[in-house]
Amino acid sequence: MRRVAVIIPARFGAQRFPGKPLADLAGQPLIAHVVDRARRARGVDAVAVATDDARIAAAAEAAGAAAILTGPASTGTDRVAEAARKLMPSPDVVVNLQGDEPLIEPEAIETLVRAMEGGVEMATLARPLEPEELERTQVVKVVTDRHGDALYFSRAPIPHRRAGGVSALARAHVGIYAFTAAFLQEFAALPPGRLEAEESLEQLRALEHGHRIRVADTAYRGFGIDTPEDLDRARALLAAGPRE
């Protein structure tokens, strides 16, 4: 049986929201909500938080996750790769779950893990694209081939529909990833790509170097906390009832 670990990168010094992982959300640190959702996903054997901050590490352990202290890293994926090397027992599949997704649905994680079957080395999620999202650069779009592997990710409207409107093939990317343990280390060691730099999308590095990314469908829309205002929205959603 393959061993699946969810590793959550978290840092204290986010520019737009310093201390975000420890911000209070319904009486708990934000990072505790992410840990709890990850632990509820079936098929997950271990949940760990990768951080360079002792305060975040303590909050992670209090929430039931392993805390792995890492050095300063240029990206969250670099931090996850370092943590995966330190995690024992070693995982076969690593899920990179952002530490600012307190409403992540356990079913979305389960869908992602299932997508890693059949020799897939990297996978991610996508959902239907809403018409009002077509021109929004903060909503990343993805198009796939007939096998469900990504052809391209872009902040631009793709695919272009000559007749106008939103193509039925258009999907919005949900930024959670799974890797085989071996490919995670390979990916982290790859030099950044030109398209990655142009779009500011790290996943394009894999495509530029000739690797495939399996894209699985999900109903989860994604809800990242980037600002204090986002946190207020999350508080309102939790007060209205937990998303199951």
Swiss-Prot record:
GO terms for molecular function: 3-deoxy-manno-octulosonate cytidylyltransferase activity. It catalyses: 3-deoxy-alpha-D-manno-oct-2-ulosonate + CTP = CMP-3-deoxy-beta-D-manno-octulosonate + diphosphate. The keyword Nuclease does not apply. Pathway: Nucleotide-sugar biosynthesis; CMP-3-deoxy-D-manno-octulosonate biosynthesis; CMP-3-deoxy-D-manno-octulosonate from 3-deoxy-D-manno-octulosonate and CTP: step 1/1; Bacterial outer membrane biogenesis; lipopolysaccharide biosynthesis. It is found in: Cytoplasm. Its main location: cytoplasm. GO terms for cellular component: cytosol. Signal peptide: none annotated. Coiled coil: none annotated. SUPFAM superfamilies: Nucleotide-diphospho-sugar transferases (SSF53448). One of its GO terms (biological process) is lipopolysaccharide biosynthetic process. Pfam families: CTP_transf_3. Its EC number is 2.7.7.38. Keywords: Cytoplasm, Lipopolysaccharide biosynthesis, Nucleotidyltransferase, Transferase. The keyword Ubl conjugation does not apply. Activates KDO (a required 8-carbon sugar) for incorporation into bacterial lipopolysaccharide in Gram-negative bacteria. Belongs to the KdsB family. This is 3-deoxy-manno-octulosonate cytidylyltransferase. It comes from Anaeromyxobacter sp. (strain Fw109-5). The lineage of its organism: Bacteria, Pseudomonadati, Myxococcota, Myxococcia, Myxococcales. The gene is kdsB.
